[in-house]
Amino acid sequence: MNAVLNKRPTIERLYESVRHYADGKKGIVYAISIGHARNIASYYSKHGMNAVAIDSKTPALRRKQFVEDFKQGRIQILVNVDVFSEGFDCPDIEFVQMARPTLSLAKYLQQVGRGLRKSKGKEYCMLIDNVGLYRMFGLPIANRDWQAMFEGRLAARVIPIASKQDTIVLPET
């Protein structure tokens, strides 16, 4: 999957989605690998967005400084690989970009949930879903019949929220 997603044309498409829908906004991006996260952050930064990558190899002090700078508005975009899936609280996040697939509903809801925190003056959070997870899981705020899901039946209705040109088509595995 990394070989498909971590290519310049794909990263350009990710960037164009953010530029089109969330230019100048504060957000968090979920990448599939350390290299993918670093390439996204580098590309975004080269094109005028203040972005940094944080991953398991980022030294603790540097990670802490990046998070503080993000919370204070000195960094616009955090690109990460499973670092901020849960337990990260920054209510003024304005967009979440899904640049990686997952088969886990729990992971999807946790990651998108980083942007769903209430914040003074915040009316909404944009979900930029470049990998089409909404097709599998529905909107993160959808009412869910959890019992039906546990029994193996999908209960969520799917509502498209990104245009076709913004979605990266992944090859069949």
PLM region descriptions:
Residues A148-T173:
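Cys/His-rich short segments
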Residues H47-N50, P91-F95, G121-M126:
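Short glycine-/polar-rich loops that comprise or flank the Walker A/P-loop
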Residues I28, H36-E86:
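Conserved helicase ATPase core of P-loop NTP-dependent helicases/translocases
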Residues P101-Q110, R114-D145:
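Conserved segment of the helicase C-terminal RecA-like domain
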Residues Y43, F66-D69, D92, K107-R114, ...:
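Alpha-helical scaffold elements adjacent to nucleotide-binding pockets in ATP/GTP-utilizing enzyme cores
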Residues M1-S33, W146-G152, V158:
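Conserved interdomain linker/interface between the two RecA-like ATPase lobes of SF2 helicase motors
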Residues R8-E12, A60, K64, V81, ...:
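Amphipathic alpha-helical transducer elements in NTP-driven molecular machines
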Residues L78-Q97, G113-R117:
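SF2 helicase motor core recognition
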